[in-house]
């Protein structure tokens, strides 16, 4: 089904497939978005948050203080503003034709169906009654798999378990897990993620986090989540860096070691098209960009080793053209 300009169907399908609007995505800086989309926008800025709108497209950034750079928060297409509704059936048909179908996940309980394209981390909210797409955003806060499943255990149980685990040595933790862990692999994966989430809720913020018993338990649980298939190597590194569980140099090494491709071979927007045939290369590039950003955030914490700083800087220089 075709749509009238200025918002043809390709505008929406491209955003779902690539996570970008005119080349700008949730990781683009304000200046990069301006260079790509122009200066015809409305914007609100305060000390810690910046929100910019280009008609349907919206970008948000955040920072801890006025001395910090703006970090991308999300990119969104506000489809509910359309005069002619965008129907999910039509968009789904176009995405399937292109070879990039979305997956429906549990509804939000507030009148919306939810769909996700996992590799681009794009989520869609759809009105249950009319079938009209309301919002398309990245990164999605919902998805498939154990990390997004409703927990089968209470928050009180999680708190009790991790408060017990934090006082045990590694052997004691292993014995406890062998006694208490679920038998089925899928339920076990959900359980390990639930324990990690429960632990992170108890882990102190600030400079006392690294090296604390809670950070040590969180690192152990990240390893268990990886063994259970909840996290792959790159996702584990992103958790460790993003949650500030290791000193900066060690966190950077974890990110760089998890890079799925070298700088010389990584796919860029200049060399590689978003096609089904290129999906492996595209997704490696996406993962490399996420790891580069996570490593870059560690530079603000004070990475000491010059070689690590140089390698991160080289990846960050590539970041604007990664997929």
Placement of each model-derived feature along the sequence:
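Short helix/turn-capping signatures at newly exposed starts of structured segments
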Residues: 1-323
């Amino acid at each position: 089904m075709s749509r009238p300009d200025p918002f043809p169907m390709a505008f929406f399908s491209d955003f779902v497939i690539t996570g970008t609007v005119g080349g700008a995505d949730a990781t683009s800086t304000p200046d990069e978005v301006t260079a790509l989309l122009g200066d015809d926008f409305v914007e609100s800025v305060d000390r810690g948050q910046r929100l910019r709108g280009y008609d349907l497209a919206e970008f948000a950034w955040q920072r801890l203080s006025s001395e910090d750079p703006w970090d991308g928060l999300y990119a969104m297409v506000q489809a509910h503003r359309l005069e002619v509704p965008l129907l999910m059936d039509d968009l789904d048909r176009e995405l399937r034709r292109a070879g990039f179908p979305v997956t429906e996940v549990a509804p939000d309980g507030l009148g919306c169906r939810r769909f996700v394209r996992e590799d681009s981390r794009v989520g869609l909210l759809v009105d249950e009654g009319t079938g009209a797409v309301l919002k398309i955003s990245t990164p999605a806060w919902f998805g498939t798999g154990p990390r997004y499943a409703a927990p089968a255990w209470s928050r009180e149980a999680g708190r009790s378990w991790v408060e017990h685990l934090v006082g045990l040595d590694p052997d004691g933790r292993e014995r406890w897990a062998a006694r208490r862990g679920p038998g089925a692999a899928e339920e076990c994966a959900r359980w390990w993620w639930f324990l990690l989430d429960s632990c992170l809720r108890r882990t102190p913020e600030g400079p006392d986090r690294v090296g604390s018993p809670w950070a040590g338990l969180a690192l152990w649980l990240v390893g268990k989540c990886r063994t259970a298939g909840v996290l792959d190597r790159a996702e584990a590194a992103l958790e460790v860096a993003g949650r500030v569980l290791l000193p900066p140099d060690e966190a950077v090494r974890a990110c760089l070691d998890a890079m799925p491709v070298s700088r010389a071979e990584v796919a860029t927007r200049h060399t590689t098209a978003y096609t089904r045939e290129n999906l492996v290369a595209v997704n490696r590039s996406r993962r490399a960009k996420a790891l580069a950003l996570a490593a870059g955030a560690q530079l603000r914490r004070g990475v000491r080793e010059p070689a690590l700083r140089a390698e991160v800087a080289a990846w960050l220089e590539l970041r604007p053209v990664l997929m």
